[in-house]
Amino acid sequence: MEQLVSGAATEQMINMLKNVADAVSMEKLNDNLIRNFSMNRLLGFLTILDTEKILMHIEEAMKQYEFLTGRKLKNSTKINLFIHVGCLTERLIRNSAIEDYPEKDKFQKIHKKEIRQIQAAFSVIEKTYSVKIPISEIGYIYDI
């Protein structure tokens, strides 16, 4: 299970299921596995957000990010984003965002394109929960 979640056994899973499931079904199975694993981890952290709903919105944001950047996120990255963005959203609702980020000004100058992509992809979180993701939090999303 650990190897499936980390992505290490994804190729093995594809080989085992290739005769009974198409690529879209296997992708959906992988996404559900990652989502359920993340939900179990998030349940212990979130107190005011509906875990199922926030996961749905984060998943939407990640798909938009993959579309905008043209790159597929690894399973481990998805899990980290589910947990980080879930907790981040709750922090923002409580007005306790992390404001510090190492060399924030330098980050803003060097990574303008990436910042715009993250802002566009995660705008669903901002709109749904009426929050604004600060540049410091965007930096931490970028690091993931």
Where do the language-model regions lie?
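A cross-family "folded-core" feature that marks the main globular domain of proteins
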Residues: 1-144
